[in-house]
Curated annotation (Swiss-Prot):
Subcellular location: Plastid, Chloroplast
Protein's organism: Ipomoea purpurea (Common morning glory)
Residues forming coiled coils: none
Protein name (database record): Small ribosomal subunit protein uS3c
UniProt GO BP: translation
Length: 218
């Protein structure tokens, strides 16, 4: 039997890097980890509330956190930062202030920067959000998958695989459906593969979306 491993963890140190960069004493490690989770959840909720979009795509690809002794630097990689900033020109400062209060970090400065991704639909997280929005609007899963692949192809990807599992179209028996376009060498460590696993709540229950995108070979 093939042992399934997370493609990002499998390539850590070769084509993938860490999303959190900090050192901590063993006794404080769990606290720092919880703080990271709190920061990420807070930012996602804030962006969801303040984005001017009907599709439900927040467009956050990833959130990098770097911690020093007296500074927490947060970099938000977004596909569509305009949708957030157009609505609120001071969105970054506002987010920074509210997050600082939430974390209650008195002796540490918080710095938030938003970086735009050149090709948003070349990112699996943004594509998964797009598919989730389509499924919530009761669009046929095959149509949603094909549209996602079209968008990914426009972003110059070398290959993509999309998988949806669960009670698809409200059927009584759960099943797995997948579609692949191009090359996706999941066993090759030097292959730069981006991956995302994303749960979506529909009226029939929870569906799981998985996306593998083959970007390049190192």
């Amino acid at each position: 039997m093939g042992q399934k491993i997370n493609p990002l963890g499998f390539r850590l140190g070769t084509t993938q890097g860490h999303h959190s960069l900090w050192f901590s004493q063993p006794k404080n490690y769990s606290e720092s980890l919880q703080e990271d989770q709190k920061i990420r959840n807070f930012i996602k909720n804030y962006v969801q509330k303040n984005m001017i979009t009907s599709s439900g795509v927040t467009g956050i690809a990833r959130i990098d956190i770097q911690k020093g002794i007296d500074l927490i630097k947060v970099i938000i990689f977004m596909g569509f930062p305009k949708l957030l900033i157009e609505n609120r020109p001071r969105a970054t400062e506002e987010l920074q202030m509210t997050l600082q209060k939430e974390l209650n970090c008195v002796n540490r400065k918080l710095n938030i920067a938003i970086t735009r991704i050149a090709k948003p639909y070349g990112n699996p997280k943004i594509l998964a959000e797009f598919i989730a929005g389509q499924l919530k609007n009761r669009v046929s899963f095959r149509k949603a998958m094909k549209k996602a692949i079209e968008l990914a192809e426009k972003a110059d990807t070398k290959g993509i695989q999309v998988q949806i599992a669960g009670r698809i179209d409200g059927k009584e028996i759960a099943r797995v459906e997948w579609i692949r376009e191009g090359r996706v060498p999941r066993q090759t460590i030097r292959a730069k593969i981006d991956y995302c696993s994303y749960p979506v709540r529909t009226i029939y229950g929870v569906l799981g979306i998985k996306i593998w995108i083959f970007l390049d070979e190192a």
